[in-house]
């Protein structure tokens, strides 16, 4: 019986039952797992918990000073466009320009580790960013937003648009049944794509569908190089980043998924088009590719009651762009691609209707629409250049500060800039300049007011440097008059000349003060070196005199205002005074400056030139029975040092130039006659035909006259240089490089030995020169003007050379408003040059893991002028307002109690003309070049600036305005300047007294704000 039971229990039936039971359990288990997997694929419960926990560790914190733990992204389109990937280079460039990091983000260790592993930084990203420039108070001066037009939320997107997008790219993304759904993966689509991929490996011809969700596509478009996925690993990193970004706010992803749709529509890349550049986002694409109004189009698509024909056009435009993102450059720019895009659009219209996304009525209407893609973006209303000169100057400075190459790139940076400009004052000045061009303004006695160009710059001296408060002109073009012009302002050059004169007196004082009078009287002095002779005599007669006292005495030296003497310097000139009643007077330097009388300053410049001529290397003046006797010491040091230095300088000017550039360089700054001598000296073999071609469009008769009168044969290199208006060695270098365009610097120096010796021999041979030909420039005079130029450059003179003429004292060498302003800033700062600032603070990438704030470091001033000279010149400028040519400015600005604020100013008027004389000595041509009027000023101890008016070209003949015009504008700006003075947001100045030492500790704010 037991055996029977045993046999029964071991029967095949029992074994089969066990197998069935086990299989059933396994099937149920697998079914359960499948159900769980399906539920997880849809609801993402486990994924939500995991990724939320991981995302919670990805934290950032903004801390003071540079960060010791920060990560920057790769070179994806989004990161490069907004400047995130270029931030390290921009921060380095800014630090080299005097900025320091005051705050920067610190990322958590998990955040850093994730980025180091190749995942893009996880944070709530911006769809729109761009450059924003604020004034000193936070008001917006300039804003650039990229993309220009974006959807703010899903509610602002027409349902037809986002439903179409989801049908094309990610149909289950907004399924409301699964609030925790992982937006980074669509499991059914992934399974379908995986199956198709496996079949393709087995030889199937079926195409493999894409499995990317909108979230992973966003990661690719924003953070992968060139917006492309290059490997399976990169795709997995994109999915990981999309998942972490999806769960940043918690396990519920409903709002995140809605935002993904909006972000995608705002970020879809749509190639680039002329007149706009890179196109990103559906709304911008609609405007630039179809010329549509996005707001109107979106309202049309959101309304079911709108005419079907109009909705069909709008819908087809949207659909084409949603399809074009797959290959935008091909589908939007190439003719074959546009044909393909039309085919794809028609195909998808039919599919969308079959699936019920659009009505058959809309489908049929859209199929009949023929769209035309533009080849250039439509024009947009532009802001007048004249209204944004201050902001444009800031943008130009930002290029230098950040090292960014173009304004196109800079305007897309996620950057907010706080500037020193005052928007209210900018607008008030701009409005005033606009009113001045209205004929009803009646500020001109004659001439068309609409053709007058005005420019105003106002700066403030503060503890943190010299701040630009106003920078405005009325030129409706990118050209910036204050920074880019080169104008002859007339008598404002007397300001630079006066400073140079006082510097010479100071140099002589510092070298000779304290020496015995007998020694001072015994010093050999050239008979016409009047400044040296006077200074030594004054020191001998006044032992122990202070520097400020001798400077005041120098201001009292008398100079004749007579126009009758022969006064030449570098060229022949006839000088005259503006007021002929001055012709018979002798004026002190002070009065000549205050009243702006020309002839005394011509003589002052003559004395300055003579002072430097006596001190040129290799030359000495000796008194040998004639007061102007000159001998030249032609020793080897002159040949080796001075000559080499000049050759090197001229080589740098012409280096690497072939024949064309050399001749074009010769054109600059020369009259037609001088250019003829230069051309024939450099190209002696050139015939009349080549000469005529170079001098077109002159008449044939004039060309022949110039050619015949400029024959260099038989003339020395010195004579040819003088006739060409250039240093003989420069003329020689130009000729040598014309023949040997690839010569090295040392080759030129070696080849120049003979000509350098020739010049020295000429100096020695002419120790007792006969009356010189006035056409021939003096070599020592030219070299003296080089020394004067160095002195002017140290104080901010902007150009590469001075015209070697005494007329430089009255404006013939030109100037620039910004640089005149800088000179007055040096005077107001007691001789110390401080940096001029427009940008105070940079705020990169606010609200991102790259956020960085920078402020300009405290400025370091450079003493370029003694405080004693600065004080003397300021006093003279004040006298110009109280009793001189700037009298109209008196009382232009008043303090709170109604009393006039101290103002100092120097005026200038330029009536600049081209005059040509015939062989009979009579003027054969006289035409206007331009007319200018300017005033450079300071107000109290804080504010200073320049106001300029000018008319260029032949039209200048129809105007007769003088410096009274900018002075009148200064008075009209009185209320604006008074408001600036009472603004309490500025930093305190460096000195309690307007003319005090700037090195002392800063005074109280109230003291600094009470101009004396």
List the predicted regions and their residue ranges:
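A penicillin-recognizing enzyme superfamily signal
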Residues: 419-448, 458, 468-483, 497, ...
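N-terminal type II signal-anchor transmembrane helix
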Residues: 2-141
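Acidic/histidine-enriched alpha-helical segments
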Residues: 181-190, 277-287, 354-373, 445-459, ...
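Short, glycine/proline-biased beta-turn/loop segments that scaffold the active-site neighborhood
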Residues: 489-585, 724-741, 834-852
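Acidic helix-start/capping segments at beta-turn-to-alpha-helix junctions
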Residues: 104-122, 178-202, 282, 363-385, ...
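Non-catalytic, structured segments within soluble enzyme domains
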Residues: 18-25, 32-48, 52, 56-67, ...
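Extracytoplasmic
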Residues: 89, 125-131, 136-138, 147-149, ...
């Amino acid at each position: 019986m037991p055996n029977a039971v045993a046999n029964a229990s071991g029967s095949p039936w029992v074994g089969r039952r066990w197998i069935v039971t086990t299989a059933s359990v396994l099937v149920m288990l697998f079914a359960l797992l499948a159900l769980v997997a399906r539920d997880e694929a849809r609801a993402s419960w486990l994924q939500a918990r995991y990724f939320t926990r991981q995302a919670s560790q990805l934290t950032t914190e903004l801390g003071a000073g540079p960060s010791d733990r920060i990560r920057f992204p790769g070179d994806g389109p989004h990161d490069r466009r907004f400047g995130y990937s270029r931030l390290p280079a921009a921060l380095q460039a800014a630090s080299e320009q005097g900025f320091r990091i005051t705050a920067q983000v610190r990322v958590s260790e998990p955040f850093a580790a994730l980025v180091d592993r190749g995942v893009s930084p996880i944070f709530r990203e911006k769809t729109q960013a761009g450059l924003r420039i604020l004034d000193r108070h936070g008001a917006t001066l300039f804003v650039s937003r990229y993309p220009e037009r974006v959807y703010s939320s899903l509610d602002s997107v027409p349902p037809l648009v986002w439903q179409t997008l989801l049908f094309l790219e990610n149909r289950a993304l907004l399924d409301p049944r699964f609030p925790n759904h992982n937006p980074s993966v669509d499991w059914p689509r992934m399974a379908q794509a995986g199956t198709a991929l496996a079949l393709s490996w087995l030889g199937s011809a079926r195409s493999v569908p894409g499995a990317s969700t909108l979230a992973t596509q966003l990661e690719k478009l924003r953070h992968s190089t060139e917006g492309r996925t290059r490997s399976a690993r990169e795709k997995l990193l994109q999915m990981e980043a999309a998942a972490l970004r999806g769960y940043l706010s918690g396990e519920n992803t409903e709002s995140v998924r809605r935002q993904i749709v909006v972000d995608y529509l705002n970020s879809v890349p749509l190639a680039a088009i002329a007149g706009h550049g890179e196109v990103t986002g559906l709304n911008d694409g609609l405007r630039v590719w179809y010329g549509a109004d996005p707001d109107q189009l979106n309202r049309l698509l959101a309304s079911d009651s709108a005419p079907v024909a109009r909705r069909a056009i709008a819908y087809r435009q949207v659909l084409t762009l949603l399809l074009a993102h797959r290959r935008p450059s091909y589908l939007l720019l190439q003719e074959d691609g546009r044909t393909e895009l039309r085919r794809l659009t028609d195909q998808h219209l039919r599919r969308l209707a079959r699936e019920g996304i659009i009505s058959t009525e809309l489908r049929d209407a859209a199929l009949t629409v023929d769209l035309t893609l533009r080849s250039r973006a439509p024009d947009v209303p532009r802001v007048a250049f004249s209204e944004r000169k201050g902001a444009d100057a800031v943008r130009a400075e930002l290029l230098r500060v950040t090292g960014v190459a173009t304004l196109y790139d800079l305007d897309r940076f996620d950057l907010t800039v706080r500037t020193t400009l005052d928007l209210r004052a900018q607008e008030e000045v701009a409005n005033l300049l606009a009113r001045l061009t209205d004929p009803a303004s009646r500020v001109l006695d004659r001439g068309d007011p609409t053709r007058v160009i005005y420019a105003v710059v106002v700066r403030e001296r503060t503890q943190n440097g010299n701040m630009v408060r106003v920078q405005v002109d009325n030129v409706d073009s990118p050209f910036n008059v204050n920074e880019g012009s080169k104008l002859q302002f007339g008598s404002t050059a007397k300001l630079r000349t006066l400073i140079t004169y006082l510097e010479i007196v100071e140099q002589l004082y510092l070298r000779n003060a304290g020496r015995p009078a007998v020694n001072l009287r015994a010093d050999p002095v050239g008979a016409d070196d009047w400044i040296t002779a006077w200074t030594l005599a004054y020191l001998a007669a006044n032992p122990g005199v202070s520097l400020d006292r001798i400077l005041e005495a120098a201001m009292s030296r008398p100079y004749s205002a007579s126009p009758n003497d022969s006064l030449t310097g570098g060229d022949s000139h006839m000088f005259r005074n503006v007021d002929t009643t001055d012709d018979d007077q002798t004026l002190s330097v002070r009065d000549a400056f205050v009243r702006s009388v020309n002839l005394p300053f011509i003589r002052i410049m003559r004395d300055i030139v003579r002072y430097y001529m006596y001190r040129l290397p290799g030359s000495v003046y000796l008194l040998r029975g004639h007061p102007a006797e000159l001998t030249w010491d032609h020793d080897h040091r002159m040949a080796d040092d001075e000559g080499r230095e000049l050759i090197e300088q001229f080589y740098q000017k012409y280096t690497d130039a072939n024949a064309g550039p050399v001749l074009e360089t010769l054109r600059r700054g020369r009259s037609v006659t001088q250019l003829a001598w230069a051309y024939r000296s450099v190209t002696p073999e050139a015939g009349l035909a080549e000469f005529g071609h170079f001098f077109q469009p002159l008449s044939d008769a004039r060309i022949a006259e110039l050619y015949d009168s400029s024959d260099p044969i038989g003339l020395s290199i010195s004579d040819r240089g003088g006739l060409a208006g250039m240093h003989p060695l420069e003329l020689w270098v130009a000729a040598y490089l014309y023949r040997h365009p690839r010569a090295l610097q040392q080759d030129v120096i070696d080849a120049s030995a003979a000509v350098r010796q020739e010049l020295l021999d000429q100096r020695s041979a002419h120790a007792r020169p006969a009356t010189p030909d006035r056409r021939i420039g003096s070599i020592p005079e030219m070299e003296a003007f080089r020394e004067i130029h160095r002195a002017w450059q140290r104080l901010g003179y902007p150009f590469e050379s001075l015209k070697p003429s005494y007329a430089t004292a009255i404006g013939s060498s030109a100037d620039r408003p910004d640089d005149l302003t800088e000179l007055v800033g040096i005077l107001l700062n007691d001789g110390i040059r401080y940096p001029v600032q427009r940008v105070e603070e940079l705020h990169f990438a606010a609200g991102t893991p790259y956020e960085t704030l920078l402020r300009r470091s405290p400025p370091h001033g450079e003493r370029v002028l003694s405080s004693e000279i600065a004080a003397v010149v300021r006093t003279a400028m004040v006298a110009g307002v109280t009793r001189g040519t700037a009298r109209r400015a008196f009382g232009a600005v008043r303090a709170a109690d109604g009393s006039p604020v101290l103002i100092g100013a120097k005026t200038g008027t330029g009536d600049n003309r081209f005059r040509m004389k015939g062989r009979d000595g009579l003027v054969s041509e006289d035409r206007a070049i331009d007319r200018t009027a300017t005033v450079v000023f300071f107000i109290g101890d804080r504010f200073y600036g320049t106001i300029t008016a000018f008319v260029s070209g032949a039209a200048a003949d129809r105007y007769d305005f003088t410096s009274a015009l900018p002075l009148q504008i200064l008075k009209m700006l009185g209320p604006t300047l008074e408001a600036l003075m009472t603004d309490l947001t500025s930093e305190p100045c460096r000195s309690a007294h307007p003319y005090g030492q700037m090195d002392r500790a800063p005074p109280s704010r109230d003291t600094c704000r009470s101009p004396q």
